[in-house]
Amino acid sequence: NLAPLDLQTPTAFDNNYYK
């Protein structure tokens, strides 16, 4: 879930995931 999503959207996902 995190791997494929991070690859497609490392910016928006990363921001939301980290926060």
Swiss-Prot record:
Keywords: Calcium, Heme, Hydrogen peroxide, Iron, Metal-binding, Oxidoreductase, Peroxidase, Secreted. It comes from the Eukaryota. Ca(2+) binds at residues 6, 9, 14. Binds 2 calcium ions per subunit. Binds 1 heme b (iron(II)-protoporphyrin IX) group per subunit. Its cofactor is Ca(2+); heme b. GO terms for molecular function: lactoperoxidase activity; metal ion binding. Its main location: secreted. GO terms for biological process: hydrogen peroxide catabolic process. It is found in: Secreted. It catalyses: 2 a phenolic donor + H2O2 = 2 a phenolic radical donor + 2 H2O. Belongs to the peroxidase family. Classical plant (class III) peroxidase subfamily. Removal of H(2)O(2), oxidation of toxic reductants, biosynthesis and degradation of lignin, suberization, auxin catabolism, response to environmental stresses such as wounding, pathogen attack and oxidative stress. These functions might be dependent on each isozyme/isoform in each plant tissue. This is Peroxidase 3. It comes from Betula pendula (European white birch). The lineage of its organism: Eukaryota, Viridiplantae, Streptophyta, Embryophyta, Tracheophyta.
